[in-house]
C-alpha cells in the first residue's frame, strides 16, 4: 500500500452513494487508485443513500427523471479538480472516470466533454444514443460495458451505439450475453458474477494501459519467493502481499485467510518446515 495512485472519479447509480458504490470505490482503491465518488444528487438532497426496495426504487427513478446531465458533468469536473489537489493522487499520469447506470452515461459524456480525461469507463449507461453526435470529441480511451438483455437499452439501440462508436479507434464496447442491466451490482437481482468479474478485469486493464499503476509483477514474485524459500523471513514474505491475503495450497488444502491466519501458517507450518537443501527450479510463469 503506497498511499497514492492515479485519480478516478466514480459516478454513482441512481441510488446515490450507497453501500454498493462504497464497495466499488474500495475495489478500485485495492487496485491502486485514488478515487472519489461524486454526489450527483446534492442539489436535491445531500447524501442520498437508497436501497433497492419498491419505495427506494420509486424515489431513485424520480431523482433520475429530474436530473440535469449538464450539471452532472459540472460536478464531475469539480470532483476532478478536487482530486488534482489531493496528495494521494498521482499528478503526472492523467485522470479517469468510471460510472454505472446513470454514471455510465455520464462517463460517456465526460469522455466527450472533458478533454483532460485520459480514460473513461461506462457500465450499462442509459441514453447514450441521445448524444452520439458528441463522440467525435472523445480524446482519451472510452470503454463501454453493455448488457445484452438490458431492459433500458433495447437491441436496436445498442446496435446503433456500437455501430456509431466503432468508427473511433479509442472506443471499445463489450457486450455481456444473457445478462440484464446492473449485472455488475453486487447482491442485486441481476448480478452475474462471471460477467462482473470479466468487466472489472477489462476496466482495470484499460485503466492500467492509460494511467497505470504499472506494477512489475515478476519482480514482486521473485521477491516473494526469495523471502519465503531462501531467507525464510515470514514478516518480509507477508509484506509482499495485500493487507488481507488468501493462500490455499491445493494439494493439501492448507494455507490461510487473512493476515493473521496466513502469517501463523507460514511461521509454524510452512516456511521453516521446508528442507534446508531445497532449491527452486522455474518451470513456467504466467503474469
Language-model features and meaning:
Residues 76-80, 158, 200, 204:
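Generic structural signal for well-ordered alpha-helices
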Residues 104, 143-149, 155, 174, ...:
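C-terminal and inter-domain tail/linker signature
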Residues 87-101:
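Alpha/beta-hydrolase fold nucleophile elbow
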Residues 104-115, 120:
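Short glycine-enriched nucleophile-adjacent loop
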Residues 119, 125-177:
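The feature captures the conserved acid-bearing segment of alpha/beta-hydrolase catalytic domains
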Residues 13, 100-104:
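Short, thiol/selenol-centered motifs that function as redox-active sites or metal-ligating centers
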Residues 40-44, 126, 179:
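Short beta-to-alpha linker loops that shape the active-site pocket of alpha/beta-hydrolase fold enzymes
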Amino acid at each position: 500500500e503506497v498511499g497514492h495512485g492515479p485519480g478516478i472519479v466514480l459516478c454513482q447509480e441512481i441510488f446515490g452513494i450507497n453501500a454498493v458504490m462504497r464497495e466499488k470505490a474500495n475495489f478500485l482503491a485495492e487496485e491502486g487508485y485514488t478515487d472519489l465518488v461524486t454526489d450527483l444528487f446534492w442539489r436535491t438532497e445531500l447524501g442520498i443513500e437508497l436501497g433497492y426496495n419498491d419505495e427506494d426504487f420509486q424515489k431513485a427513478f424520480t431523482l433520475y427523471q429530474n436530473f440535469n446531465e449538464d450539471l452532472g458533468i459540472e460536478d464531475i469536473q469539480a470532483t476532478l479538480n478536487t482530486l488534482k489537489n489531493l496528495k494521494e493522487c498521482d499528478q503526472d499520469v492523467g485522470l479517469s472516470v468510471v460510472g454505472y447506470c446513470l454514471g455510465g452515461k455520464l462517463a460517456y459524456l465526460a469522455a466527450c466533454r472533458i478533454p483532460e480525461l485520459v480514460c473513461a469507463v461506462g457500465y450499462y449507461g442509459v441514453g447514450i444514443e441521445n448524444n452520439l453526435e458528441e463522440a467525435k470529441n472523445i480524446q482519451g480511451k472510452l470503454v463501454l460495458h453493455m448488457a445484452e438483455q438490458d431492459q433500458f437499452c433495447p437491441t436496436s439501440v445498442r446496435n446503433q451505439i456500437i455501430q456509431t462508436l466503432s468508427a473511433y479507434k479509442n472506443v471499445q464496447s463489450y457486450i455481456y450475453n444473457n445478462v440484464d442491466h446492473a449485472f455488475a451490482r453486487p447482491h442485486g437481482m441481476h448480478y452475474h458474477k462471471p460477467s462482473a468479474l470479466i468487466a472489472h478485469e477489462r476496466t482495470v486493464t484499460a485503466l492500467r494501459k492509460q494511467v497505470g499503476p504499472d506494477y512489475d509483477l515478476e519482480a514482486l514474485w521473485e521477491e516473494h519467493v526469495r523471502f519465503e524459500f531462501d531467507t525464510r523471513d515470514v514478516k518480509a514474505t507477508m509484506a509482499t502481499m495485500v493487507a488481507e491475503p488468501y493462500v490455499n495450497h491445493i494439494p493439501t488444502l492448507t494455507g490461510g485467510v487473512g493476515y493473521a491466519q496466513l502469517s501463523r501458517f507460514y511461521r509454524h507450518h510452512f516456511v521453516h518446515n521446508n528442507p534446508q537443501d531445497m532449491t527452486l527450479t522455474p518451470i513456467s510463469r504466467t503474469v
